[in-house]
């Protein structure tokens, strides 16, 4: 079962939770709107289903409302930032805004962000960049509980460690919708398994192993502890290739930022801590803006001439599925599964908001 709700009503409902937890009305609205935008974009895994976990993290003292990103090191075009365990949706945006200031001065900014609470959908930060005609690359590590097994391993050793690349397409009056590639280095995001578990759906073959290291289709193995108290694991996408990307994210985002890497036992906290290394570039500063813009469009047009494969509607560029989902869900509403809705209601009762 499920229910359908408008994005505005859902944002108000979730913002009330965060404001009750100590955020200003402005921050509560910003975080809630970011989560709802993930739902609108078709990524329910990163949407309001995370709200209950955020509330628990605040109540445990591991998520700090109204935190502000701090500059730890400053070398002009290079910044080392501390997220101070604040909402990723606010400190992540603050980090990007600092980067935009440095790009205006230097043409490029490289920054590390350590100890931010869950940054949400990383594509949001790439979208911020491409709206300004900038290119951005993001490497992220995840500190919560280990969820993904190394290629050739049989238990979870690290997080879903997403990567994201945003590239503007066109220039001036000939600007098109951008290329925004945002993906977990696991075959699927853990949140998608939470949604599948809540909805009673099976996972695709090759996605999961159980607590014994055997292949399984049961998404619950990475959502709830199994009979022996252990959990299963997600598998990396592309076998050794996705595994290699995940390791790169752990080293670039976790180690390089000062936030840390996975080599410890999870202590049961509900907080999800992200570290991120980001590179933001003004393509015009490389001296080939007009060529870059036209060449990018020519290449995209060339690809679109490929006939659709049997049983498909043809190629889609990264970012297009999200834009289509937003249009449809803004029109028809957002479908929330019963388990996620119950979690929101439980949070309201816990915080004294229930009517």
Predicted regions and their residues:
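N-terminal glycine-rich anion-binding loops that anchor highly charged ligand groups
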Residues: 2-10, 23-49, 63-74, 270-273, ...
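A generic, well-ordered mixed alpha/beta core segment in the N-terminal half of proteins
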Residues: 79-172, 180-183
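Phosphate/diphosphate-binding glycine-rich loops and adjacent basic-rich segments that engage nucleotide
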Residues: 148-223
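N-terminal nucleophile
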Residues: 155-158, 165-168, 184, 244-260, ...
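Small-residue-enriched flexible segments
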Residues: 190-258, 269-271
């Amino acid at each position: 079962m499920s229910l359908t709700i408008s994005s505005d009503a859902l944002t108000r409902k979730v913002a009330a939770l965060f404001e009750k937890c100590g955020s200003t009305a402005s921050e509560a609205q910003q975080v809630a709107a970011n989560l709802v935008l993930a739902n609108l974009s078709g990524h329910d895994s990163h949407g309001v289903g995370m709200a209950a976990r955020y509330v628990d993290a605040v109540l445990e003292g591991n998520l700090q409302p109204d935190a502000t990103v701090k500059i730890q090191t400053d070398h002009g075009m290079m910044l080392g930032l501390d997220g101070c365990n604040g909402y990723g949706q606010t400190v992540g945006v603050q980090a990007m805004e600092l980067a935009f200031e440095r790009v205006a001065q230097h043409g490029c900014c490289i920054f590390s962000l350590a100890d931010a609470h869950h940054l949400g959908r990383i594509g949001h930060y790439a979208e911020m960049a491409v709206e300004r005609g900038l290119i951005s690359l993001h490497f992220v590590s995840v500190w919560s509980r280990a969820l993904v097994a190394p290629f050739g391993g049989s238990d979870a050793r690290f997080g879903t460690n997403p990567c994201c690349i945003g590239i503007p397409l066109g220039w001036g009056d000939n600007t098109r919708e951008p290329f925004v590639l945002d993906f977990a280095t696991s075959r699927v995001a853990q949140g998608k398994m939470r949604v599948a578990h809540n909805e009673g759906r099976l996972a695709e073959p090759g996605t999961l192993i159980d607590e014994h290291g055997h292949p399984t289709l049961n998404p619950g193995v990475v959502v709830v502890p199994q009979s022996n108290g252990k959990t299963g694991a997600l598998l990396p996408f592309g076998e050794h290739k996705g595994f290699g990307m995940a390791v790169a994210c752990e080293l670039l985002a976790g180690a390089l930022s000062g936030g840390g890497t996975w080599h410890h036992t999870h202590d049961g906290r509900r907080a999800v801590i992200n570290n991120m290394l980001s590179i933001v570039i003004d393509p015009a500063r490389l001296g080939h803006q007009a060529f870059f813009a036209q060449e990018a469009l020519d290449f995209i047009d060339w690809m679109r001439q490929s006939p659709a494969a049997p049983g498909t509607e043809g190629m889609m560029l990264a970012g297009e599925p999200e834009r289509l989902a937003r249009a449809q869900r803004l029109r028809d509403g957002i479908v929330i599964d019963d388990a996620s809705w119950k979690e929101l209601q439980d949070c309201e009762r816990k915080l004294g908001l229930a009517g």
